[in-house]
């Protein structure tokens, strides 16, 4: 679990979702353990100065590569990065079923290659749910688990 001094930092652009989240956190007695940064992640992340143990990416698929580039300098060595939806309903590995998801699917195909080959990560894509990326930051270069 998270230590008593631990803090979760989350980024959210929607004021409606922030209000809803704050309400849930308050009712759960966890409001003081979570800091919500308002805005788009690509605009907020460059201003973060903390070092993180864990980064979870679940946002616009076309921007995943940029999120990873911004997150890695903030992640401690040995820290974990988790990325959601990397198999995109199977479309990443096969035929695109929905034309409106072509850009997202192609972006995820590119991202998955970048992720598993990244020189600062030991990473893989797991076929859990809709595809989960799991990587550990290391300075020793990539390897397969």
Regions found by a protein language model. Give the residues of each.
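S-adenosylmethionine/decaboxylated-SAM
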Residues: 1-145
């Amino acid at each position: 679990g998270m230590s008593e001094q631990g803090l979760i930092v989350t980024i959210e652009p929607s004021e409606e979702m922030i209000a809803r989240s704050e309400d849930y956190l308050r009712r759960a007695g966890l409001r003081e353990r979570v800091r919500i940064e308002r805005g788009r992640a690509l605009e907020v992340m460059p201003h973060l100065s903390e070092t993180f143990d864990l980064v979870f990416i679940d946002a616009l698929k076309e921007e995943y590569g940029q999120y990873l580039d911004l997150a890695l300098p903030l992640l401690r060595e040995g820290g974990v990065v988790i990325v959601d939806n990397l198999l995109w309903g199977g479309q990443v590995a096969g035929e695109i079923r929905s034309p409106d998801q072509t850009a997202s699917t192609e972006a995820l195909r590119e991202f998955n290659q970048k992720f598993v080959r990244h020189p600062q990560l030991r990473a893989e894509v797991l076929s859990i749910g809709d595809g989960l990326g799991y990587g550990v930051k290391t300075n020793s270069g990539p390897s397969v688990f």
